[in-house]
From Swiss-Prot:
Organism: Deinococcus radiodurans (strain ATCC 13939 / DSM 20539 / JCM 16871 / CCUG 27074 / LMG 4051 / NBRC 15346 / NCIMB 9279 / VKM B-1422 / R1)
Entry annotated with the keyword rRNA processing: yes
Chief location of this protein within or outside the cell: cytoplasm
This protein's encoding gene: rimM
Protein name: Ribosome maturation factor RimM
PRC barrel domain ranges (all copies): 98-174
Length: 188
C-alpha cells in the first residue's frame, strides 16, 4: 500500500477516493473517509489533478456514495477518475458535533508515549480499508499507527486535537525502526 500524496487545495479535508464507475451516465463511487452525510450537501468537490468540479448530485450507496460530477457524463469519463482523491474546503463542510474533528486536524500534531516522551509527528492519516492509520514521522523514518486502536488517545483542547497520546497498552516499538533495521536501512 502506498501513501497518497497530499494534492488537494489548502485548508481542505480529504473526503475519500474514487473507486470506479457506477452505471453508464457518469456516476462514480466514492469511498468516504468520514460521514457520508457530510458530502451530500456539498455543491462542489476538488478532484485530484482535475480541480474543482460541480457536484450535480450525490446518492447514498452504503457504505459508499455515488457522485455525479459536472463534465463527467459517461462510464468512460468516470473510469478516468478511478483512484483519485476527493477534497472539500473546511468552510464548505458542515459544522462538526462537539468532541469530533476532521482527520486533517491531526496533521502536524506531536505523538507522545505513555511516559510523556515525544515519539514523532503525524504527517497524514491514511485509509487502509477498515482501519485508518496515522502516518507518524520519527527521526529515522515513518511508522503507521492504527487510529482507532484503544491505546491511541486524541484529547481535544478548545475543540481541536492538541496531540496524540499512546497509552501504556501500546505495543512496544510501535513507532520507530523495525527490528533488524539500523539508521532506516534493513540489514541483510
Amino acid at each position: 500500500m502506498t501513501r497518497p500524496e497530499a494534492s488537494g487545495p489548502p485548508d481542505a479535508t480529504r473526503l475519500g477516493h474514487l473507486l470506479g464507475p457506477h452505471g453508464v451516465q457518469g456516476g462514480i463511487k466514492l469511498y468516504v473517509l468520514g460521514d457520508p452525510a457530510q458530502v451530500l450537501a456539498l455543491k462542489r468537490v476538488y478532484v485530484e489533478s482535475r480541480g474543482w468540479l460541480s457536484l450535480r448530485r450525490a446518492e447514498g450507496m452504503p457504505p459508499n456514495l455515488v457522485l455525479y460530477l459536472a463534465g463527467v457524463s459517461s462510464r468512460e469519463g468516470a473510469e478516468e477518475l478511478r483512484g483519485l482523491q476527493v477534497y472539500a474546503t473546511d468552510a464548505e463542510l458542515p459544522d462538526l458535533e462537539e468532541g469530533t474533528f476532521y482527520y486533517h486536524d491531526l496533521r502536524g500534531l506531536e505523538v507522545y508515549g505513555a511516559g510523556g516522551e515525544r515519539l514523532g509527528t503525524v504527517s497524514d492519516v491514511m485509509d487502509a480499508g477498515h482501519q485508518d492509520l496515522l502516518v507518524v514521522d520519527y527521526g529515522g523514518g515513518t511508522s503507521f499507527v492504527p487510529l482507532q486502536a484503544p491505546y491511541v488517545e486524541v484529547p481535544l483542547a478548545g475543540g481541536k486535537p492538541g496531540a496524540v497520546h499512546l497509552t501504556a497498552d501500546a505495543p512496544a516499538g510501535l513507532i520507530g525502526p523495525e527490528p533488524g533495521e539500523e539508521d532506516g536501512a534493513a540489514e541483510s
